[in-house]
């Protein structure tokens, strides 16, 4: 993972004296999916230390602290909360990262962007020290190779329906002889453009491989998928699952929920078998009928609670609705209220 790419441009051949990294307690605003305030500990962005004339030498890695990977945090029992980025806007990616999400999924399956646009989003996320996951347009070795060369911390393969497809997905992530991934590790962002000499020995331990199950056929094979060596997470896809069952855009249908619960239990059964003997973590999307706190109680380890476009759409619709309602009320009342309530939630609030 290219965690240091953001900092290398300001480092020179001269010696450096590193500054310790400090942390800030951030109180997050109330989420549309969570009822209570949440707090996180987030490292302050590191500023390149000044150049000093000294005989002490340091390496680039000495000037930063390396946060735990998503994979490590899952193994430590954390529940991670993230966002899907469909706009491919680096600005929205950075805002999401600074807001405190544990991860951001850059969605190449349903978003309009390609590799170049995804790279810009990964730069923005790296600047805010937030892990990126890339969801591929399809489970394909060429797409996987190009995405992995960008250096995301995780990769998600859509529409995995059986053990064979899951094994192929894992093979796309590993170099020969363990897989079929093409090698250009000396010049790609994933290895800090060849500067990270430990990339080849570490990347398999750090990369989070996610297989998305989103069909009735996939649910039937979900335990086999979860037990494939190298599959770290099984991501549930309730919308496509409902469509495959004949209930398009109705993931809250009773029959869809029953199948989804069966799938969840199948994945969790493999998780309980322990990391040494295989098994995967359970991840999924929150829905209006299935809120994040309910998913956490059912055993989900990774939860995506929102989509950037959806959040922006809802904010816009609510903003226009509020203004239109004020116009309607003004028809019966000529007095204009210039108080605080009229300016609430505009600009900075």
For each predicted feature, which ranges?
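Expand to "…catalyze enediolate/carbanion chemistry for C-C bond making/breaking, isomerization
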Residues: 2-349
